[in-house]
Amino acid sequence: MSMSNFLFTSESVTEGHPDKVADQISDSILDAIITEDKTARVACETLVTTGLAFVAGEITTSSWVDIPDIIRSTIKGIGYNDSSMGFDWSTCAVITSIDKQSPDIAQGVNPGEGLFEEQGAGDQGLMFGFACNETPVFMPMPIYYAHRITRKLAEVRKNGVLEFLRPDGKSQVTVEYDDHRPKRIDTIVVAAQHAPNVSYSMIRESIIEEVIKKVFPPELIDDKTKYFINSTGRFVIGGPMGDCGLTGRKIIADTYGGQGSHGGGCFSGKDPSKVDRTASYMARYVAKNIVAAGVADKVEVQVAYSIGVAEPVSLMIDTFGTGKIPSDRIAEIVRKLFSFKPANMIKQLRLLRPIFKKTACYGHFGRNDPDFTWEKTDMVEPIRELAGI
């Protein structure tokens, strides 16, 4: 961005948003399979709509998992437990259509079967990682607080503080920047699905008091901050009844809220051999450690692949002018300390574990969870040593 003073907006959605229901189903199936078969190839897509969950994809595995049961238990855990919502775990129809992974793809991924000996990338493509020092978790402030709102909406719904809430919901946070640094919260937008017999005034007041005020530090909010709560006046029909949900439709909320770049590939339902997911996690790991090391205030890492080839075809580092050393020097350090070969990324980040369902809502990045190994900052000292800072 050329402007130094500007507004920037990011959004998040709750676990009951139809697209996120689909993501969680896809990743729940992946978790169940990877628990039994570490070598499985999974590409699992989900569609949810009124009274129906449809799962299709390409899965090659030696294990057997009860996909309909996984679908229903995931929906139940989210909170769709009443047929009046138009989508209910116990009564919705479940349809599956699963094929095996194409052998033409498999021979490029499986070690020793294609043109190259090493495990190759599962597809061509470009992936990005991003980090900045705006928040304690090295995420941009707008998406950081947007996720905190949606997590809080789910929390107060599930613990009974706001019993009138239903699972679907969205948030949007606009941050005012001054000289490229966050200054204040300009606008907060919340859409929260609710029971039909609740007044608008109660919904608005309750969300401001029990969600917004519990999420934002008072120094970021002022008398000019604008609130838009359920700004149509009513949000009763929601979830898969209100909108058809599909896996992979929330890739910006999944990543950095529109800051930085995105290669276009989604994450959910994909096993770790898919570089859309694994290389994006690795690029975040690299970017976060660079910023945590103090080498730059903001950094973006791009990596790209050819299908069946282990080594990336390109690696790019951009510090947006904030680097303490030149970007080409940072790239040299990255090449020395990190490997972007699929097998090495999977090993370093320990991705052959059933950890993916919890990545499927509230962001894949900026989470303080030990299972999110790509969020560790354990490479800070080696980076500092090579950077000479």
UniProtKB/Swiss-Prot annotation:
Biological process (GO), any one: S-adenosylmethionine biosynthetic process
Annotated residues for binding of Mg(2+): D19
SUPFAM superfamilies attached to this UniProt entry: S-adenosylmethionine synthetase
MF terms in GO: ATP binding; magnesium ion binding; methionine adenosyltransferase activity
Pathway annotation from the record: Amino-acid biosynthesis; S-adenosyl-L-methionine biosynthesis; S-adenosyl-L-methionine from L-methionine: step 1/1
Segments of this protein annotated with the region Flexible loop: 101-111
Main location: cytoplasm
CDD domains recorded: S-AdoMet_synt
Compartment(s) of residence: Cytoplasm
Subunit (UniProt): Homotetramer; dimer of dimers.
Name recorded for this polypeptide: S-adenosylmethionine synthase
InterPro entries referenced in this protein's UniProt entry, alphabetically: ADOMET_SYNTHASE_CS (IPR022631), S-AdoMet_synt_C (IPR022630), S-AdoMet_synt_central (IPR022629), S-AdoMet_synt_N (IPR022628), S-AdoMet_synthetase (IPR002133), S-AdoMet_synthetase_sfam (IPR022636)
Binding site for K(+): E45
Keyword Nucleus: no
Top-rank taxon, per record: Bacteria
Function of the protein: Catalyzes the formation of S-adenosylmethionine (AdoMet) from methionine and ATP. The overall synthetic reaction is composed of two sequential steps, AdoMet formation and the subsequent tripolyphosphate hydrolysis which occurs prior to release of AdoMet from the enzyme.
Cofactors demanded by this protein: Mg(2+); K(+)
E.C. no: 2.5.1.6
Family: Belongs to the AdoMet synthase family.
Catalytic activities: L-methionine + ATP + H2O = S-adenosyl-L-methionine + phosphate + diphosphate
Keyword tags: ATP-binding, Cytoplasm, Magnesium, Metal-binding, Nucleotide-binding, One-carbon metabolism, Potassium, Transferase
Record: residues binding L-methionine: E58, Q101, D243, K274
GO annotations of cellular component type: cytoplasm
UniProt binding sites for ATP: H17, D168, G169, K170, R234, F235, D243, R249, K250, K270
